[in-house]
Amino acid sequence: MSFRSQTSSTTSMRPVSSYSSRSISLHRSVPLGSSASVVGGAGGHGARISSGGFGLASGYSSGSSFSMSVKGSGLFNNEKETMQILNDRLASYLETVRNLEQANSKLELQIRETLEKRGPTTQDYSAYEKVVEDLKSQIYDMTVNNARLVLQIDNARLATDDFRVKYESELAIRQSVESDIIGLRKVIDDTNINRMNLETDIESLKEELIFIKRSHQTDVEELRKHISECGVQVDVDAPKGQDLSKIMEEIRAQYETIIQKNREELKDWHNSQILIVETEVKENTEALQKSRTEVTELRRQFQTLEIDIESLRTMKASLEANLHDVEMRNNMEMEGFNFIIRQQEADLQQLRTSIQAQVHEYQALLNIKMKLEAEIATYRRLLDGEDFRLQDALAVQTTKVQKKITVTETVVDGKVVSQSSEVQEIKK
């Protein structure tokens, strides 16, 4: 971003006779009954002054001055000598004018050389801008890396939370499976106790059956023995009674069938229960082993993530320390750059002040030049033989000079990188 500012100043030259520091005065007085005349010439050129008294004086601030006076109450006796003196004074005056013009030209040349010499030094900030851009790019890259690390840490934290939730759910499942296994073990124990009780009942029933068989056999033998000893034969005209032994055999067969059936049913039920329990135990054992494997894997992943998080934290701390160091170095370099900029601005302000002083000096010299030109013109008219008052001539010749000073400044990002000035004179 650049802009230009122009500053214009207009200087109007008033009539020469109005300046107090440099004055040209011409007094003419003609007393009663007196007359004066001066006639002279140099190189075929003459001038006539008719006055009773004549005086001319001029001075200027540079230290060079001349004065010319012609006094008399009558006619001059030596006109050529008087004109020679006037010509010498005029030549000295013109020499002074030429010296002032040369000094003015030298001053303008010095102003241009100063502007050309100091101009490029104030606008060469390319090296500083490159360093600043490099530092800005480094800061931006470190900021992006820091943001990336923060994002990775957040992702790792979310993954850790997810694994923790999975671990807790798997732990709850493991605990429930272990409680189910404990319950199944209790069921197995109860089943074993019932089986042992049933086996005990079977043994007792077998013993009771053997005892009943023996008792029945004893009773039958005793009954047969008693019948044989009695030797009584009784014939009864009645239907033949049932054979008790046959009945006992049938009862025994029925009981054995029932016992065998119950034994087979109990055995089948016991085998089925054992098979179910073994299947459940096998499934629960497999699930428990799988859960243990998953828990081990999750624990390993959790430890790996903890190690990664710790390494990321260490990297983050080191990057923050590096960023702090870079910021400190950047601040120090920026302070140095600001000091250089302030120094350059002070030099620029001093240059502006110097230019302004030189402009004022140039304006003063220009005023002197204009006044001298007016006085030279007046002398020429006097030498040409014109007889009039100098004040009237100076009053008629009013020269107006408009002086335009253009100061151009190029500002980039609030910094003055170049400056130039241009002086224009417009006579009206």
Curated annotation (Swiss-Prot):
Keyword Cytoplasm annotated: no
GO CC, one annotated term: keratin filament
Subunit field text: Heterotetramer of two type I and two type II keratins. Keratin-18 associates with keratin-8.
Official protein name in the record: Keratin, type I cytoskeletal 18-A
Family assignment from sequence similarity: Belongs to the intermediate filament family.
Domain IF rod: 79-390
Sites annotated Cleavage: D237, A238
Annotated spans, Linker 12: 224-247
